[in-house]
């Protein structure tokens, strides 16, 4: 069991530096709960593999602008109930995005609130505004274990909860687009795959199918894969379903708009084909919130006896 270590918004986001833009997010979400925007030693970046930046299609993305952001956003909703174990939903953004952009564009905080779930949202910075899926330190062995330890330590040091003795509960790993790669690495060698209760791929199954299947076979967590016709994930999604069918592993394949709450709650492997474009799959129909509602996370308000 892991415990803590001892030791106008659109204009602001468009013009501010990464640290300044992130800092201005905190008061913007105060009505919903407590947002902390901080920096982690264990955050994906900086990383030696991107010390000289990254070249994509002959264009160089320098390290200073794209691979030096160690920002991690942590949001605790009003009314969070302390139980001694904290459930986390950790979302990894895709290409050409940032922490501030992800919170704004996909309304993750608003969707968490709408779900009514007793969970903490965490959004670490990946490659900032770059065409890159590299997960930095979170791709290293035990990288996720170190990240969660620093996360718990931060919550403890900031006095977020009244009780000091708390540990990691269930963890949902969510990723849009290029966010798939860091999730696959976490499941494969992050050190705490057993804590990953669910994996959500928002038009993100581009590769690493073996790692996702290995996690599912070993830990029997819920895998939700929503895919589009033109986002580049259809072939891999259909190939994964074919593998499951060949080995007689049950799964649900349904149109995203027709999936019922009961279907989402009772199936372990779920493939949702959608008519939405790539960048709309997280927020347009509030799927992030719907996935949360059908998760095993506790509600903010306990059910009436």
Describe every region a protein language model picked out.
Residues 85-88, 92-155:
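Active-site machinery of serine-nucleophile hydrolases
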Residues 103-112, 185-187, 206-216, 255-258:
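Alpha-helical scaffolding within the catalytic cores
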Residues 163-177:
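Alpha/beta-hydrolase fold nucleophile elbow
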Residues 180-191:
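Short glycine-enriched nucleophile-adjacent loop
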Residues 21-87, 252-257, 300-305:
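A domain-start/cap signature at the N-terminus of enzymes
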Residues 193-204:
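A conserved short beta-strand
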Residues 7-16:
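Bacterial N-terminal signal peptides
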Residues 226-241, 245-305:
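C-terminal catalytic histidine-bearing segment of alpha/beta-hydrolase fold enzymes
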């Amino acid at each position: 069991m892991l415990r803590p270590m001892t030791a106008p918004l659109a204009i602001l986001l468009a013009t501010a530096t990464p640290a300044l833009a992130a800092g201005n997010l905190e008061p913007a979400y105060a009505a919903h709960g407590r947002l902390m925007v901080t920096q982690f030693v264990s955050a994906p970046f900086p990383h030696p593999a991107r010390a000289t930046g990254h070249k994509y299609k002959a264009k160089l993305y320098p390290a200073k602008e794209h691979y030096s952001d160690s920002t991690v956003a942590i949001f605790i909703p009003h009314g969070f109930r302390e139980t001694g174990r904290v459930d986390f939903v950790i979302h990894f953004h895709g290409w050409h995005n940032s922490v501030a952009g992800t919170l704004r564009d996909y309304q993750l905080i608003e969707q968490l609130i709408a779900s009514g779930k007793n969970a903490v949202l965490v959004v670490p910075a990946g490659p900032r505004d770059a065409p890159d899926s590299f997960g930095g330190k979170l791709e290293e062995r035990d990288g996720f274990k170190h990240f969660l330890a620093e996360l718990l330590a931060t919550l403890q040091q900031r006095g977020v909860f009244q009780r000091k003795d708390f540990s990691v509960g269930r963890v949902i790993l969510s990723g849009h687009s290029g966010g798939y790669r860091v999730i696959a690495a976490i499941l494969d060698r992050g050190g705490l795959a057993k804590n990953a209760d669910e994996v959500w791929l928002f038009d993100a199954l581009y590769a690493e199918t073996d790692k996702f299947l290995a996690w599912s076979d070993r830990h029997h967590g819920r895998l939700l894969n929503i895919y589009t016709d033109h986002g580049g994930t259809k072939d891999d999604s259909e190939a994964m379903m074919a593998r499951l069918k060949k080995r007689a592993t049950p799964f649900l394949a349904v149109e995203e708009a027709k999936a019922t709450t009961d279907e989402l709650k009772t199936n372990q492997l779920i493939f949702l084909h959608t008519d939405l474009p790539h960048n709309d799959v997280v927020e347009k129909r509030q799927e992030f919130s719907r996935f949360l509602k059908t998760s095993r996370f506790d509600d903010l308000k306990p059910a009436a006896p």
